[in-house]
Design a protein with these regions (language model features):
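Short alpha-helix in the Rossmann-fold core of NAD(P)-dependent oxidoreductases
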Residues: 40-45, 61-64, 91-92, 152
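Substrate-positioning beta->alpha
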Residues: 125-131, 145-168, 174-178
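Mid/C-terminal beta-alpha module of Rossmann-like enzyme folds, strongest
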Residues: 169-192
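NAD(P)H-binding glycine-rich loop region in Rossmannoid oxidoreductase-like domains
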Residues: 4-43, 47, 51-54, 69
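Catalytic helix-loop patch of NAD(P)-dependent Rossmann-fold dehydrogenases
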Residues: 39, 43, 73-121, 125, ...
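Conserved Rossmann-fold NAD(P)-dependent oxidoreductase catalytic core, especially the SDR/UDP-sugar
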Residues: 47-87
Length: 192
């Protein structure tokens, strides 16, 4: 456990064979001052990559977000031009670039997998899906806007399985994957 906003000094054995799974982020939007997204997500990426550099770690799996695409409901692919429009989305795109620069310094030796998950749900997330479930179960649910709002999502265990699979089956260079279930359902479909 460490604070990625500062230089990472952890007292554990580290080898070049280790893998870094970088999950560190300030992510709830809205909910934080703009500066918090940049300080944690960008400075954190710098410090994680510096730690990997210092110990010769060759593999990083970075969890970004679909937020670099900006707020829109049309289908996005990994080739879609990112157009982030929130501090969170901007900070995650910059963090991706920082990780990519780390990988490019030793192109043939380092692996970088970037995953861009949608809304992640599962036990303990206490976010959108948990609130939706308890609202419906308690008979207190109401639509907080449009019924046809689309939210791309993925179950946390499926995301982890995918990351482990990619780690074992990585191609050279940088791999970038959007991680959401197909099809993305409307909030009305999820409620039903």
């Amino acid at each position: 456990n460490c604070d990625v906003r500062s230089e990472i000094n952890i007292d554990i054995p580290v080898t070049s064979e280790d893998v870094i799974f970088n999950f560190a982020a300030v992510h709830r939007t809205p909910g934080h001052p703009d500066q918090a997204y940049f300080e944690t997500n960008i400075r954190g990426a710098e410090n994680v990559c510096a730690f990997a550099e210092k110990f010769g770690i060759k593999k990083i799996v970075f969890t970004s977000s679909i937020a670099p695409y900006g707020a829109a409901e049309d289908l996005k692919t990994e080739e879609t031009l990112p157009t982030p429009n929130t501090p969170y989305g901007i900070s995650k795109l910059v963090a991706e670039k920082i990780h990519t620069i780390w990988q490019a310094k030793k192109l043939n030796e380092r692996q970088l997998t970037i995953v861009r998950p949608g809304v992640v749900f599962g036990k303990g997330e206490n976010g959108n899906f948990t609130r939706l479930y308890w609202g419906i179960r308690g008979g207190k649910f109401f639509y907080p806007g449009r019924k046809d709002t689309i939210k791309a999502c993925i179950y946390v265990k499926e995301l982890v399985r995918f990351m482990l699979y990619r780690l074992e089956n990585h191609s050279e260079g940088v791999e970038l994957y959007n991680c959401t279930f197909e099809s993305a359902f409307t909030i009305e479909q999820k409620v039903e």
